[in-house]
Amino acid sequence: MLQIKNLNLTHKKDLRVILSEFNLVLNKGDKAVIIGEEGNGKSTLMKWIYNPLLIDNYIEAEGERLVGKEILGYLPQEISEEDKEKTIYEFFSAEEMFWNRTPKELSEITGKFGMTSEFFYSDQKMGSLSGGEKVKAHLMRLIIQDVTVLLLDEPSNDIDINTLEILEKIINDWEHIVLFMMKL
């Protein structure tokens, strides 16, 4: 279960209230979407849910975040500068769970995305991937990590129809919690 109680988010710089008295409860199998205009704090909320420290330097946050035994996985809108410089192999091999997967399991994961397991071992830079390839790579890494909560921050931006269909299938087939942010 993922639960948020009485969350208030306020910008430290201008004291603008982003969110007031926000409550949310998601249980296994739940899928929810938060829709809002650009620049109204959806990504800030998503980052806080994933790790409150990610927004600590610019947002004052009050409220409770209860994750229990859930393992949260976050798909950001943009790949980090650090990850852009990594090869695909470095991106995946940095995850301990990658090494715990059998070749068959890795092949099954890439198969869901219309790729082969050789993708994991590529020396291509993450920053050179298309928008759809970046989304696929991040989702595969989250699956490898055995997350139980998918936090997807506008993942349908900058992706092709094929990747959109794969994303839709992953979300529909996901047995755990999905929280999806999208703009109006």
Region annotations inferred by a language model:
Residues M1-L184:
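ABC ATP-binding cassette signature C-motif
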